[in-house]
């Protein structure tokens, strides 16, 4: 009877955790509808609770990112901005090849995977290369539908896609900093080396002035994937830029990939942003942060608004049992928030860091 009793407790706690995750998602929707000052603002942890959200006998957390993520050993809690990433459905080769862990050949293969033709980009891969695989399959020749689809692109490796962050929680877990003792293979340098997955999206989309004037109804009923109609015109009527990045939330790694940027300029922007957490609205502060004419080239690719978010929810039920994790991508460009993608993250294991794990495993300190 003892094991049946324990199993029943786990099942009940798991159901509690699942409902807590559902409740936390509804809480996020409520915040979007009632707490944001302006449409397109980022819902920071200053206006909503993102950790230890008590829902009945369960507790939920929203796993986020911070500017210091590469050295953190416990998670940062918050919402993940999809507009802080590079859109792999629209970014040109020159941007893609600058992403960490990526090779020029893989960047070219991404272009060939998503374009409509069978013409091989220099060093890329079209149908012939895929037909020569041990288990042959076709080249899609259509936009990405998920970022995980990168696994299918010719030349992809697990290390390239995930880096050391195999559970995708954005922090350096013990098994990601122990060399060859436990998976994944890592260099035990005390720093989390991300793969490409951390820095890319297919969902980011900032509406054009024409779309804004048409209203949310036409945008919500268009049926288009957000990442497939993402373009803005450069000031002065120049060429359209294929995507934009939220300079208020993007990492230095992402910013360094943009035209006119490099690692030094990108780090200056992030450092200024961290030192001035409430900068003036718009992009004027970027020119204040960086005294360089090069940054002017990047301005058309920058925005301070966002409408697509990832809500990475982890919860436990009563007595610290029944751990559940699920990730949602939410689009807020219509009249009401819409879930674009849901992914069960349970199989990636514990994502709340060693401190919370110790509390959960210590009855006297268990999170309730």
Indicate where each model-derived feature is located:
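Compositionally biased linear targeting/interaction segments
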Residues: 1-368
């Amino acid at each position: 009877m003892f094991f049946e009793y324990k199993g029943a407790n786990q099942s009940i706690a798991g159901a509690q955790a699942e409902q807590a995750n559902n409740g936390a998602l509804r809480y996020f929707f409520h915040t979007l509808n009632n707490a944001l000052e302006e449409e397109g603002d980022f819902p920071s942890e200053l206006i909503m609770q993102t950790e230890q959200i008590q829902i009945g006998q369960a507790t939920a957390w929203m796993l986020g990112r911070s500017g210091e993520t590469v050295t953190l050993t416990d998670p940062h809690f918050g919402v993940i901005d999809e507009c802080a990433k590079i859109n792999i459905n629209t970014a040109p080769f020159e941007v893609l090849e600058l992403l960490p862990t990526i090779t020029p050949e893989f960047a070219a293969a991404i272009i060939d995977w998503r374009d409509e033709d069978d013409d091989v980009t220099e060093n890329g891969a079209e149908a012939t290369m895929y037909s020569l695989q041990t288990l042959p399959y076709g080249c899609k020749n259509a936009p990405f539908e998920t970022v995980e689809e990168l696994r299918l692109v010719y030349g992809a490796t697990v290390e390239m896609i995930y880096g050391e962050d195999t559970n995708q929680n954005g922090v350096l877990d013990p098994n990601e900093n122990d060399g060859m003792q436990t998976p994944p293979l890592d260099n035990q340098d005390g720093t989390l080396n991300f793969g490409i997955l951390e820095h890319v999206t297919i969902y980011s989309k900032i509406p054009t002035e024409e779309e804004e004037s048409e209203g949310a109804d036409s945008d919500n009923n268009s049926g288009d994937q957000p990442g497939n109609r993402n373009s803005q015109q450069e000031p002065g009527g120049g060429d359209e830029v294929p995507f934009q990045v939220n300079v208020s939330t993007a990492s230095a790694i992402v910013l360094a990939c943009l035209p006119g940027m490099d690692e030094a300029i990108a780090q200056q922007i992030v450092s200024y942003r961290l030192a001035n957490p409430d900068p003036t609205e718009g992009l004027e502060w970027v020119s204040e942060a960086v005294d360089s004419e090069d940054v002017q080239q990047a301005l058309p690719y920058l925005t301070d608004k966002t409408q697509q978010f990832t809500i990475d929810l982890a919860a436990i039920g009563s007595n610290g049992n029944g751990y559940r994790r699920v990730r949602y991508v939410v689009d807020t460009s219509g009249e009401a928030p819409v879930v674009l993608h849901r992914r069960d993250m349970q199989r990636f294991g514990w994502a709340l860091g060693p401190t919370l794990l110790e509390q959960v495993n210590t009855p006297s300190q268990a999170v309730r």
